[in-house]
Amino acid sequence: MPYQCPITFNDEQLEICELKNQLEIFTQYQKSEFLNHHPVTDLVLLRSEYMDLLLNRLWEHFGFSKLPHIALVAVGGYGRGELHPLSDIDILIVSQRTLPSALGEKVSQFITLLWDLKLEVGHAVRTIAECIEIGSDDLTVATNLQESRLLCGSEDTFQELKLKIHSDSFWPSETFYKAKIQEQRERHARYHDTTYNLEPDIKSTPGGLRDIHTLSWVARRHFGATSLLEMSKYGFLTDAEYRELVECQDFLWRVRFALHIELRRYDNRLTFAHQAQVAEHLGYTGEGNRGVEMMMKEFYRTLRRVAELNKMLLKLFDQAIINGGQTQEAEILDNDFQRRGSLIEARKPALFQARPETILDMFIHIANDSTIEGVSPPTLRQLRTARRRLNRFLHTIPEARDKFMDLVRHPNALHKAFSLMHKLGVLSAYLPQWSQIVGQMQFDLFHVYTVDEHSIRLLKHINRFSQVENHDKHPICCEVYPRVQKKELLILAAIFHDIGKGRGGDHSEIGAVEAYSFCIEHGLSKPEAKQVAWLVQNHLLMSVTAQRRDIYDPDVITEFAKKVRDEESLELLVCLTVADICATNPELWNSWKRTLLAELFHSTQRALRRGLENPVDVRDRIRHNQQMASALLRKEGFSAREIEVLWQRFKADYFLRHTHTQIAWHCEHLLRLEDPSQPLVLISKKATRGGTEVFVYCKDQAALFATVVAELDRRNFNVHDAQVMVSKDGHVLDTFIVLDQHGEAIDEARHKAVAKHLTHVLADGRPTKIKTRRTPRNLQHFKVKTRVEFLPTKSKKRTLMELRALDTPGLLAQVGATFAELDINLHGAKITTIGERAEDLFILTSDAGGRLSEEQEQALRERLTEHVSELAP
């Protein structure tokens, strides 16, 4: 039987235990009704009505209803009659004069009872004069008072308060408006001025409920409008805008209500810990994370709609009401457009509906003139109307296609025009595929932006390659990009590179097919269309090769160069790759990745210039490194004989996989070593391959790799590359490239302590027990299936193994310990972290020195899967 709200509470029900029970029954009833798809608007209003009943009865129970000059008033969200399960219940006890101490004590007992009931009560006890005095200096208090609603008590007292609140002297409309605009700016800044946050605050994020409240507050202060419906009656909203705001508010309320029934304490953050459950409550389902991604897509789209309406309506209010309709003189640009101040506007009220292709003309003007900062509010309203009434996508209009390509080829379009086209929904109106990626997120820590936002940021990063001030950060791209003759090919590849996401299948293949069709439709030649399609299809190739393959292996370079084909493709690909990494996550780009990509770029460039039929001779490379290193060592006073004796202990691989400067640095310290039986640990002062090099020399011992990486992990250092070698006389020559937790080289002040501790551990000779740090909170809500794959390789002597797993603390040490447990030799490792996932490559041999057998591979797969799963939170 459905729970019924009581009309009254009798005296027996006013016992605290009974009240708690009644509240719990009501809360469970609301949860059940919500999960049975009862309209959230009804539930939000019903909760407010229920609290009204409870507070009225308690007010009467305490005897306050007999007092003539005191009133109980709901303020804030409760004043609006909007309560979610964990919403604060904000009340004001207002009187005409200061309460006597005995009455004040009784009021305190009333508030204490509400707290004892576990209600989230925010309260104030003030006289009317105090309300006005405090509210005059405090915008939040003033805003809450605007939404005050009498619950019970003195009507005269409440009306006197309302009269003073609505007087012109208390926060005049213009003053209130400007203060709320500044408050909103500051709030948006706290969320980086974007609607796209991984764990968004439903209430406060740009485009969230607070943006709707801001519109309501401004309209209430100026017009006296108490609801969205009244705002439309005053002409502040059109009927269509009113319906859209109601629709957006309803969706955000449903998300918030679903979140609140999952929480025990008040919070409006849609964290990773609760996104899946909220999605399930709202009926979003699918394989894996599909349900979450579908919900968040609608969530982000809703935020975009609210943010757009908020910005437009506040500007219209400013222009029409605050400035009294006065505007700057217009400067005519052409027959269709003019500029007024820093804003562009259409000269005809139905321009976009009559000739939709002129929408693109507006953005060509914006690209032509850097002083145009945006679109005027009336034109924005016209654009929104035209956008909704389009009966076909803009790309189907031949004139629009020409104008779009003019923008793609425009040297200034990347700076502002494309981001504005996206923000104002024009890219979605132009290209159906783009409309599908708007709000498309991925439930992980790697992609911090939605697909559409990421793609726009990618375009902006490409634009930065033309700016001299970015040369130090992106030396190759800043050198290459200015000489790219057909930049439009790169820009189109950027637009399409992720456009296939969210549709199942390989997004690179989907995007390549659609990019080719788009290019042909827009008048590009077949070779140009093929180049764009190739870039889209292979936009991950360079990043994957650099970070997850052994780029010091000549065969890897040759294979990569064959796929790239020519220098023009290489130059386009490196620009796309770097921009893609930078636009995926601000924390991804560091000196390590820059160095890896630079080495791959230059090695491939040399291979292409030399000709793929003329691969580099490994012996020549070894000889070159030895000659250069020997010259450096002789400058330090070492004889050729000393150098030769030392080098006779090393295998050829050592000279192939280190630079001549690394070799000279290692050998200088080895030649100065007083006791060769003691471990040597070196830490580079200068960055090596974009990180700090840790060189370890000691007698080979069990689980040495696991020991070293475990010690580094304890100090919050991340190993990104490892070269593991054993000399002919059984000494290890291991090199680790390490970064700190911020992706930077290790602070030199820590070098001495780290080297000393590692030396002590290695001298002890016993394997270090793997002690894992606590798994970070943001990793605890992700599940990554452990996968062990053995990759095809031309080598008959070595096995390549790729591990994919949750990037838990101690993972690498556990992997190393497993190798030692199974008598498997490790020769190299490439460590890649992609958000919450580790994707690591290991070069292995059996204890006998050859490739692993199928039986050994299977045993390793099973043991690794078992051990890694034990690390999961």
Swiss-Prot record:
Regulation of its activity: Uridylyltransferase (UTase) activity is inhibited by glutamine, while glutamine activates uridylyl-removing (UR) activity.
Domain of life (superkingdom): Bacteria
GO molecular function, one term: [protein-PII] uridylyltransferase activity
EC annotation from Swiss-Prot or TrEMBL: 2.7.7.59, 3.1.4.-
Comment field on protein domains: Has four distinct domains: an N-terminal nucleotidyltransferase (NT) domain responsible for UTase activity, a central HD domain that encodes UR activity, and two C-terminal ACT domains that seem to have a role in glutamine sensing.
Name recorded for this polypeptide: Bifunctional uridylyltransferase/uridylyl-removing enzyme
Region (Uridylyltransferase) location: 1-332
GO biological process, one term: regulation of nitrogen utilization
Required cofactor names: Mg(2+)
Segments of this protein annotated with the region Uridylyl-removing: 333-692
PANTHER family the UniProt entry points to: BIFUNCTIONAL URIDYLYLTRANSFERASE/URIDYLYL-REMOVING ENZYME, BIFUNCTIONAL URIDYLYLTRANSFERASE_URIDYLYL-REMOVING ENZYME
Similarity remark: Belongs to the GlnD family.
Sorted UniProt keywords: Hydrolase, Magnesium, Multifunctional enzyme, Nucleotidyltransferase, Repeat, Transferase
Catalytic reaction(s) noted: [protein-PII]-L-tyrosine + UTP = [protein-PII]-uridylyl-L-tyrosine + diphosphate; [protein-PII]-uridylyl-L-tyrosine + H2O = [protein-PII]-L-tyrosine + UMP + H(+)
UniProt-listed Pfam families: ACT, GlnD_UR_UTase, HD, NTP_transf_2
Mitochondrion keyword on record: no
Ranges of residues in domain HD: 451-573
Role played: Modifies, by uridylylation and deuridylylation, the PII regulatory proteins (GlnB and homologs), in response to the nitrogen status of the cell that GlnD senses through the glutamine level. Under low glutamine levels, catalyzes the conversion of the PII proteins and UTP to PII-UMP and PPi, while under higher glutamine levels, GlnD hydrolyzes PII-UMP to PII and UMP (deuridylylation). Thus, controls uridylylation state and activity of the PII proteins, and plays an important role in the regulation of nitrogen assimilation and metabolism.
